[in-house]
A protein has these predicted regions:
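Bacterial N-terminal signal peptides that target proteins for export
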Residues: 1-11
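Sequence context surrounding c-type heme c attachment/ligation sites in exported
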Residues: 5, 17-188
Length: 189
C-alpha cells in the first residue's frame, strides 16, 4: 500500500519541477543578462547551443564612433538568426573605465511599446523587449528601437547586448543566443 502512494507523490514532484522551469521571458529577461561586467547572457536559461553559434548575430546600429556629451542617439538592436519566430534582447550602457567604471552611462529611452527600460536594484538601466516586442519583425530577423542619451560626464562607455532567437517551442531548449559589445570614447572637447 505504501508503494501505491509513493509513485503518485514522485510523479507530482516531477510535475512540480517541470512547472518551475522557466519557459520564456516574453516580457523581458530579468535584469543583468547582457554578458557585460561579469553578467551572464540569456544562456543562463536558454540552453542547448553555444553563444554566437550558427552564423547569426546581434548588433546595435546607430552608435557613433565617439559620443557627444548629452546628445540623444537613435539606436536599433538587430538580431539576425535562422528560424527566429520570437526573440528578445537586453542592452546596457555603462562607463567602461575610470572612477565611474560599471556605473550607468547616460539614459536609455524606449520609443515604442516594443521596448521597455528597467532600473535594477543596483541602479543599472537595462533596455529589453516587451511582450509586444517578442514576435520577430521578419523571417530570421528581429529589431528593436530605442534612444540613448549620452552622459554629461565624459569617459569611455561600454555597450553590452545579448539577444535570444527563440525556436517557437515555448521552452528554454535549443534557442540561439548571441552577444556583442562595443566601447565608445567621448568626443574631444
Amino acid at each position: 500500500m505504501r508503494l501505491r502512494f509513493t509513485i503518485p507523490a514522485a510523479a507530482l514532484s516531477l510535475l512540480g519541477a517541470a512547472v518551475a522551469i522557466p519557459t520564456v521571458h516574453a516580457n523581458g529577461p530579468p535584469p543583468g543578462h547582457t554578458g557585460g561586467f561579469g553578467e551572464p547572457t540569456c544562456l543562463e536559461c536558454h540552453v542547448g547551443n553555444d553563444l554566437n553559434a550558427f552564423g547569426g548575430r546581434v548588433a546595435v546600429l546607430g552608435l557613433p564612433k565617439t559620443y557627444e556629451r548629452g546628445r540623444r542617439y537613435s539606436l536599433t538592436v538587430v538580431l539576425e538568426a535562422e528560424e527566429t519566430t520570437s526573440a528578445g534582447f537586453q542592452l546596457s550602457v555603462r562607463y567602461g573605465g575610470g572612477a565611474q567604471w560599471g556605473d550607468p552611462a547616460g539614459v536609455l529611452v524606449p520609443v515604442d511599446q516594443r521596448v521597455s527600460v528597467t532600473r535594477a536594484e543596483t541602479g543599472q538601466l537595462y533596455a529589453n523587449q516587451t511582450l509586444q516586442g517578442s514576435p520577430s519583425t521578419d523571417p530570421d530577423l528581429a529589431t528593436w528601437a530605442l534612444e540613448w542619451v549620452a552622459p554629461s560626464v565624459g569617459g569611455p562607455v561600454a555597450i553590452h547586448v545579448a539577444a535570444n532567437s527563440a525556436n517557437g517551442d515555448d521552452s528554454p531548449l535549443s534557442d540561439l543566443v548571441y552577444a556583442a559589445d562595443v566601447t565608445i570614447p567621448p568626443a574631444r572637447r
